[in-house]
From Swiss-Prot:
Protein name: FMN reductase (NADH) RutF
EC numbers on record: 1.5.1.42
Family: Belongs to the non-flavoprotein flavin reductase family. RutF subfamily.
Top-level class of the enzyme under EC nomenclature: oxidoreductase
Catalytic activity: FMNH2 + NAD(+) = FMN + NADH + 2 H(+)
Length: 180
């Protein structure tokens, strides 16, 4: 027996989503369409063969045009010390001011890599699916850099929090999650 789908009010959905903790990332791009970036928590792993991330971007975002036209992104995983930078990239601040607030480098695609992020996933956009107000980007990881993940920044209950390990050795390359 198939259940009938019922409409869920957007505010009820947002309230329930506040119960879902998520890593905080800054997604960046650079290329002929310009340099841009935005704060995102709607990111997850799709598969490790080939390495692919899912990144959601609101089509109303100031970074949208640059991201979709450049067809490259870097997902910069933030640590606790990056909360102010996350707020900057999540606001209405011009792109040049956002990028001036931190040190950046690049990997394979030319998308900006935050110098002291926990990890950076440098990607080419392989596919895009339009859903409601957002595009879901399937991003093929072509390079990555891992700087250490001892105190990552998460967003939960409409607030920033820190999650991490007290012993940096616990954040080594062979974690239980890496094995899945």
């Amino acid at each position: 027996m198939r259940m009938r789908m019922q409409d869920v009010a957007p505010q009820d959905y947002r309230d329930a989503m506040a119960c879902l903790g998520a890593a905080v990332n800054i997604v960046t791009t650079d290329g002929s369409a310009g340099r841009a970036g935005f704060t995102a928590s709607a990111i997850c792993s799709v598969t490790d063969d080939p390495p692919t991330l899912l990144v959601c971007i609101n089509r109303g975002s100031s970074a949208y045009s640059s991201v979709t036209r450049n067809e490259v992104v870097c997902v910069n995983v933030l640590s606790a010390r990056h909360e102010p930078l996350s707020r900057l990239f999540g606001g209405k601040v011009p792109a040049d001011e956002r990028f001036a607030a931190a040190a950046w480098s690049t990997l394979a695609t030319g998308a900006p890599v935050l110098a002291d992020c926990s990890a950076a996933f440098d990607c080419r956009i392989a596919d895009t699916v339009n859903v409601g107000t957002h595009d879901v980007l399937f991003c093929r990881v072509v390079a990555l850099q891992r700087f250490g993940c001892t105190d990552n920044l998460i967003y939960f209950g409409r607030a920033y929090h820190t999650v991490g390990v007290t012993d940096p050795a616990e954040a080594g390359p062979e974690s239980a999650l890496d094995a899945s």
